[in-house]
């Protein structure tokens, strides 16, 4: 899929972390180790159950879910891992496509630098990646809708230009890449949200 913030066609595209997460029982395991945080963790965006479920769904769509483990935050395009979370790795990988996308939300370096500067994010650590992804969601005009109604079909279409694994209104990727179905994403989101709410006793 095109990485977060990508607005160009195939030359900057990326398949979802080398398709490392297929639509199988194991890859769709929504048992979340990526749990809710307390408060805003010093960031702009509070991680409510709805927002965490959204972030987890983006990870699922982009192939970085890894059953909610933190190693999903260290994935580069193609499925390789990087260790230094002090910064975006900015490593160009040539696979089916050529991309330098990295992290749980497959940020391109240019996108990451812009959002990190705007939000004053000092590293590429997981909580900063979460904040940056929510900022991109807000920038696409989908955050308030998801806060109120959950991951609607309309919200998916709004996010399709940001993450090519999300379907447009036609059900296709905005960039001609492999795409998750609306039903698949809605099912994952709903299941994950239920588990997150159960953690809070809601």
Cite the ranges covered by each PLM segment.
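A short, structured beta-strand-centered segment in the mid-to-C-terminal lobe
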Residues: 122-125
């Amino acid at each position: 899929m095109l990485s977060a913030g990508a607005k160009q066609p195939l030359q900057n595209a990326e398949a979802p972390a080398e398709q490392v997460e297929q639509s199988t029982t194991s890859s769709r395991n929504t048992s979340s180790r990526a749990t809710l945080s307390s408060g805003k963790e010093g960031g702009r965006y509070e991680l409510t159950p709805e927002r965490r479920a959204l972030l987890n769904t983006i990870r699922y769509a982009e192939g970085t879910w890894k059953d909610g483990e933190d190693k999903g935050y260290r994935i580069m395009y193609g499925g390789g891992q990087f260790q230094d979370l002090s910064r975006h790795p900015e490593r160009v990988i040539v696979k089916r496509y050529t991309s330098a996308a990295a992290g749980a939300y497959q940020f391109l370096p240019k996108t990451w630098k812009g959002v990190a500067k705007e939000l004053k994010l000092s590293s590429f650590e997981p909580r900063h990646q979460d904040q940056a992804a929510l900022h991109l969601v807000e920038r696409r005009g989908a955050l308030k809708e998801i806060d109120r109604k959950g991951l609607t079909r309309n919200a998916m279409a709004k996010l399709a230009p940001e993450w090519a694994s999300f379907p447009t209104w036609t059900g296709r990727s905005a960039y001609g890449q492999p795409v998750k179905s609306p039903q698949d994403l809605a099912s994952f989101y709903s299941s994950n949200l239920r588990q997150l709410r159960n953690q809070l006793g809601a």
